[in-house]
Every structure is written in C-alpha cells, then in structure tokens.
C-alpha cells in the first residue's frame, strides 16, 4: 500500500511539473496557443503584412503594412524582408536579415523569423506521398494565450499497466491521417500488448520521422474521448522494452496533442485499431470540457 501511495505522489509531482511546463509550451509567448494562422504556400511569392492586399494579412494594430515575402520555387523557400522592416532569426538576433533561405521544421536547424510580436516558421508536411509547404505565424500578444491550468484525472495505479512489446517483422508503415486531412506514412515498428481487468488489448506503436529516441510512442482513443478527454486522440510515451520485450504503459501520463489547444496544429491521429473500448480515466483532461455536476456518478470525474 505504501508503494501505491509513493507512486501516486510521484505521478502527482510529475503532473504538477508537466502542468507548468505544458502551460509554458502551449500558453507561453511562443506557445501553441499563440498561433494565429497556418497558411499553405503555392509556388511563387506570398506576401505578409497588415495591408489586406497581402496574401497573409496580420493584425493592423501590431504589424507593419508590409512585413516581407516568401518565395517558394522548386520545393525551396526563401524570405525577403520589406524595406525598413526589422526581421531577426534565432541564429542572428543581433542583426536584422534582408533575405534568407528558409529551413523547415523537418531539418536539423529550422529557420525561425521574429519581427515585433510575430514569430514565423516554415513547415513541410507529407500528404499522400507528396510534400506541402506552409507558414506558421505566432503572435506573442494573442488573447488566446490566456487559459486556465491543465487538469487531470486522479492518479490511479490501475492505469500503470505491464505490457509486452512485439516488433513487426520487416519494415512496415501506416497511413496516418492528420487533423487537417493530410495523409502521412509513418513507421510502425511494433505493437504493445497488455491486459486490463482480464481483457487483452493492443496498441500500434508509431515512429515519427523526426523522432530519434528509443522511447515508444502511441496515439490512442477510448470511451472518455466523448467528454472527459480530448475527442480526437491522446498521446503517451512508453519506456524502451527490456531484452524480453517487457515495458510499462502509464496512462496516468497520457497527454493531449497540440491540436487540443489550437486549430493551426497539424497533429496526427491514431491509426485504425488504436481505439480502446473502455473508459481510460487517467491522464490529461480535455481542456475544453466543463464538468457537469449531474454527470454519471459511476465514472471517475477529474478534479
């Protein structure tokens, strides 16, 4: 029993730390909630600024009439600052840039442009075996950054589940649909098999292209997705298995994807088959769900 209380205390401490960290990641000046747009680029020139004639129009009270432009040509992008506008990069914060080649978030050193409260990133996403290019723009003064603290289901050691990792024979990939309807093929190195309340379950492990760790990543849905947890998906990281394939899935550490906090994220959704037909009353709560005092008292309610 003391072991259980020690575990609960440890996870609660992690939840507090994660809440602080996640609040910064999602609601900080450069967090996901500060995103004000995601614009897919076409070949040619895309202009940015407060003037409504620009391809991308920014708030008039915080942006210059013309901030700059992006040229996309042969799957390569470059940025040119408008005359008199100071634009900086993370690697050259002391001197403004006039023109610069853009490196995407799929590259080791992605380009991040900053001008006033605006932060501009260049991203590339696979869609049905082709690549699409886009700009993400954050506004560090966005009102969307104001949000309540994260909430969690009460920690329950029941949801710390022993699992066995079963590798997939040969190379395998799965078509993964994203929140914006894009289709990406991601590696499927193996499955996690486990038992809850005497019933057997399995989750497919997914490896994203930019993931260079040995940890296992799963995306899943369950019956709480209707209300208590975020409807689209939850994510969980799992420690690497031992030599016998043994590991632990701790659903108390399940967390929401970025798209739970902004409509401008490109979150992947779980593959078909990663739905658990039970109420996983553990992990992070749906940030948009307000508890109803009259809800079914037979289910655990987040506090």
Q: Predicted segment positions?
A:
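Extended, aromatic/histidine-rich regions of cofactor-dependent oxidoreductases associated
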Residues: 148, 225, 237, 246-248, ...
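Beta-strand-rich interaction surfaces with strong enrichment in secreted/lumenal proteins
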Residues: 99-100, 110, 191, 234-240
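C-terminal boundary/linker segments immediately following FHA domains
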Residues: 1-6, 11, 82-83, 88-162, ...
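N-terminal pre-domain segments of enzymes
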Residues: 1-39
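Forkhead-associated
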Residues: 9, 35, 40-108
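Conserved, compact domain cores that house catalytic/ligand-binding motifs in diverse enzymes
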Residues: 145-210
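Mid-length scaffold segments of soluble, non-membrane domains
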Residues: 47, 60-64, 69-80, 183-230
């Amino acid at each position: 029993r003391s072991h259980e209380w020690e575990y609960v205390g440890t996870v609660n401490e992690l939840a507090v730390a994660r809440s602080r960290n996640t609040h910064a990641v999602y609601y900080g000046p450069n967090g996901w909630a500060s995103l004000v747009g995601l614009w897919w680029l076409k070949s040619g020139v895309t202009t940015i600024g407060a003037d409504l004639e620009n391809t991308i129009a920014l708030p008039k009270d915080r942006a210059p009439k013309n901030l700059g432009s992006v040229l996309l040509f042969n799957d390569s992008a470059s940025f040119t600052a408008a005359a008199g506008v100071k634009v900086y990069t993370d690697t050259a914060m002391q001197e403004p840039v006039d023109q610069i080649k853009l490196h995407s978030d799929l590259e080791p050193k992605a380009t991040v442009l900053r001008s006033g409260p605006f932060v501009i990133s260049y991203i590339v996403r696979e869609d049905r075996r082709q690549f699409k290019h886009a700009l993400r723009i954050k506004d560090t003064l966005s009102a969307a950054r104001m949000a309540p603290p994260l909430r969690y289901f009460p920690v329950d050691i029941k949801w710390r589940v022993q699992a066995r990792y079963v590798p997939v024979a040969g190379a395998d990939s799965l078509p993964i649909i994203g929140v914006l309807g894009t289709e990406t093929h991601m590696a499927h190195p193996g499955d996690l098999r486990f038992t809850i309340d005497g019933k057997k379950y399995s989750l497919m492990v997914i490896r994203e292209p930019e993931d260079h760790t040995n940890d296992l990543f799963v995306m899943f849905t369950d019956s709480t997705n209707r209300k208590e947890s975020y409807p689209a998906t939850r994510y969980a990281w799992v420690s690497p298995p031992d030599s016998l394939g043994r590991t632990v899935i701790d659903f108390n550490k399940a967390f929401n994807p970025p798209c739970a906090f902004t409509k401008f994220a490109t979150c992947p959704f779980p593959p078909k088959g990663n739905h658990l037909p039970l109420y996983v009353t553990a992990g992070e709560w749906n940030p948009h769900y307000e508890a109803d005092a009259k809800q079914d008292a037979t289910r655990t309610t987040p506090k």
